[in-house]
Structure formats: structure tokens, C-alpha cells
Amino acid sequence: MKQIKLIANALLGIAFCLAGTSCQTDAVSTPTVTSLNEALPVGSTRTTESLPFIKGADLSYTNELEDCGVQFTENGVAKTSYELMNSYGANLVRLRLWHNPTWTKYSTLSDVKKSIKRAKDLGMYVLLDFHYSDTWTDPEQNVVPAAWASVVNNTTVLSDSVYNYTLSTLQTLLSENLLPNMVQIGNETNKNIMVADNSLLEPVDYERNVQLFNAGLKAVEDFNNATGKSIKTVLHVAMNPGDANNWVANLKALGIHCFDMLGLSYYPQWQSYTPSELGEFTSKLYQTYGIKLLVAETGHIWTREWNDNCHNLMSKMATGYPEKPCPQLQKDFLVEVKEAVRNNGGAGVIAWAPEWVSSTNVTLWGVGSNWENVAFFDFNNQLLNHGGIEFYSENNVAVTFNVDMSNAGSSAKGYITGEFTADANGNWQIFPMKQVGSSSTYTFTTHLSQGQTGAYYYLSDSVWTARETVPENLQGKWNDRLYQASSTEKEQIISNTWSN
């Protein structure tokens, strides 16, 4: 996460080395590691475990929040963030790992072990995110761990440190039956990585970056070869699709080792492309390089309100969305991202810090959360009603409301309101609908849960006095229309005519 800014089911295979796509296999010298055999033990076989489409949550904050007394509830019943995410369909937990942080006891290897066990106890997969730093890394900061500072200018020795650290971490986790299914080699590595000072992030030294990436990738490969495991590898950037494509091309030209997935951070606050454009890039990336696209971090606001004095990072709505946030639109964005990635052969989608609510937790920037308006919980730590967590579910229906506004006059435009537009306080909001060509028909699509019902009506302008008068024979709830999402279909159209 950029913390400095105030920061059909596609199966995953192991790395695809397509014809015409070179995969460097010896770009880093391999130190001798005596506790790993050079070949598989006699009688063992390489596992070829395939992962399902990933629907994940980065829950790196959970242990700290619980230590601060945070308790999550659903309909008044206390549940952990792990239990809640899993119950709605999340199948993976992403966890950040810092090398040796001195300012916090969290995101250390000891802390991560606790989190991995929690995930595995629920049958969830794990992605371990190596930051290769003692603190946050992102496009604006990427400082080498203090323990490696003396060799920061010797790329060969620094690469050996990366290799040995990555390998020894995996060995330790294997010995405790806590092995991750996926490993991320660096976090939001747009610029130079593992530098002495953040003033050295640019110009980007791709050759140095590739050597360091290869050290981590080679460590995972050697671990897999020696143990028969098949941990998948991820490289991660926070870029738009065009820049990300160029980034991969640069690495390929310099002999990057094979890796399974390209992770993207995708936030409306910093990336303005659409889920549709994300889907196009997902397809292009695999067709060109044989690399799966993983949205390693994403999230969307459900309110612009704050619940503490810690500056919130996000306030923008996704491109093309109404300007008024609500839990339903948070869900809509995440569902669109999921479907765009899955329908184009991508690896999956991970929501970042959906549990990071306001508390007494301490960050480098203050006390509290920079993310409570992006979390899946309200300001009382109650799970949002029809909010972002429902994107994990496969029981969503794309409901399209169509209204013919010809009876409303030539200057009228289409707007909609209803229970699904309710803001953080339960107040309905007015959303603009999109005109279909030059016709009098206006349309709005949202992703409701199967069987979900509620009241709604149309307006001819963006003010409450412009509402339609729904005839008594069309009233389904109060004096309004009634929608009911299908219980069996994935798509549904509700067509109406404006009523005077």
C-alpha cells in the first residue's frame, strides 16, 4: 500500500515460459545453503498444486487492531476479520513482512507466523509479501534494511543477502508447517528498490533491480526444487496498464527470472483507468508474456467521513461512478474489478486492509486509521450492509434499471434513488443514470445480492422535488417501486416507464 501518500475460474499454473519469451535462470549466483538439498529427496515428487481464482484480503493489521481492543460484529455477533472474510468467500490472506522493524512489533516474522496459522486454520491460502525493508515500501520509499546497509552499493553481495533471507524465511515457515502458497518479491516496486536513501529512487536502475528481483525469485525456485513445493511468485507495481506493460518489457529485456504473476495496485485515488481497461491489460499481459495479472491491492471508499484525526488517504470515486459514495458503490467497484480480471484470464483480486478501522493503533504518521472510510465496516466496527465484503460472494446479480423518460418532457434526464443508494447514515442518495444513445431511455447497473429487495424510484432531475409519482398499482414498498434481485440468474434487467 502506498502508505507514504499517506500510503471461467482461471487456474493458476506455475510460470509460463512461452516460445519467444525468455526466462533467465542463472542471473544470480547462488550461495551454498547447507540445509537444503540440491535435488528432491529420494522418493519425493514435485507438487503442481493449482490455485483457484484468488479472492483475497490483506489482513496485516488484524493482530494489532485486536491488541488495541477492536472487535468486529455482524448483525451484533462478534466475529474475527478472518472469519468474516472467509464466510463471504475470501480464499486467501495477504500478509506483509518487514525485515527487522524497530518501531513496531507487527509485520515481523513472529507476527506473520501467527497470521499464517489463523489463515490456514480456516483453510485459506496465503500470500507472503516481502518488503525487503524495515518499514513501508512503495513508489515513494524503498529503503534497504538496516542490516544490509553496509552492502547497499555492492549489488552482488546485496543480492546474496536477498537470496539467503528469502530462502531461510521459507525454510523456517516450512519447518513449522506455515508455508505460504505465494510469495511477493518486493512491494510496489515502481522505482529503485533497496536504496540507501529515498533520494536515490530515481533514475531507475533496471539492471540493479533485475539482479535483486532475480535473487528473490531464484531463492523461491531453489526452495521449490529442493522441497517439491510449488510456491508461486509475484512482482508488484502501482502503475497504469501502459506503464506496467513497459515495466515488464524492460525487465524481460534484462533477463528477469520467470515469475508467475504481475501484481498491480489499483486504487481510484491514484489510478484513473476503468475496470474494463484493466481487463484488456489482463488479457494482453498473458498473451504477450504468459504472466497472470493479480490485483494485489485494491479498495474503494464507502464514505468521505472520518472517524478519527488521522488523515484519510482516499476520497475519490472510481471513474464513471456517481460522486456520492455508499457501501453499495464500494461493492460495485470491487465486483467489476473481480469480473474484469477473471473474465480475461487473470489470477485474482485482493482487497487491501478491509479491516483497518479506527482504533488506538500507532503508525508512523499518527494514531488511528488512514483507511476507515475504505474498510468493510462502519464506524462502530459493524459489517457494512451490502458493502464491499460481498464482492467475495458468487451470489451477486448485475441488475440493470432501465427507464423510458419520454413522459417526463424533452428536457428531463434520468436519475434513480432507492435503498441500495443509502449512505453511511442510511440516507438515500440520487444517482445519475446514463442515456442510451440519443434515446429517451436511461440506464443504471448495480450488483445486488441474489434475492435482495428494496424500494426505489426515478427522478427527472438531481433534486428530490423532481421525483416521479408512482401509481398505486405499481407501488411495492411504501409509495415507491420495489426491486427484487433474481435468486438464480447472474444478470437481470428491470424496465420501467416514467410515471407522472
Each language-model region and where it sits:
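Active-site cleft segment of glycoside hydrolase catalytic domains centered on the general acid/base Glu
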Residues: T108-D111, D138-K252, H257, S272-E280, ...
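Aromatic-rich carbohydrate-binding modules that target alpha-glucans
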Residues: V403-G451, D461-Q484
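Active-site beta-loop-alpha junctions enriched in small/polar residues
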Residues: L59-T62, W98-N100, H131-T135, I185-N190, ...
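Aromatic-rich peripheral "rim/lid" segments of glycoside hydrolase catalytic domains that contact
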Residues: E305-E336, A340, N344, W352-A398
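Bacterial Sec-dependent N-terminal signal peptides
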Residues: Q3, F16-R46
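Glycoside hydrolase catalytic-domain groove-lining segments
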Residues: S81-Y82, D222, A226-K232, D243-A318, ...
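Hydrophobic faces of well-ordered beta-strands that scaffold small-molecule active sites
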Residues: K55-L59, V93-L95, V126-F130, N181-I185, ...
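N-terminal substrate-binding region of glycoside hydrolase catalytic domains
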Residues: R46-K114, R118-Y125, H131-V162, S168, ...
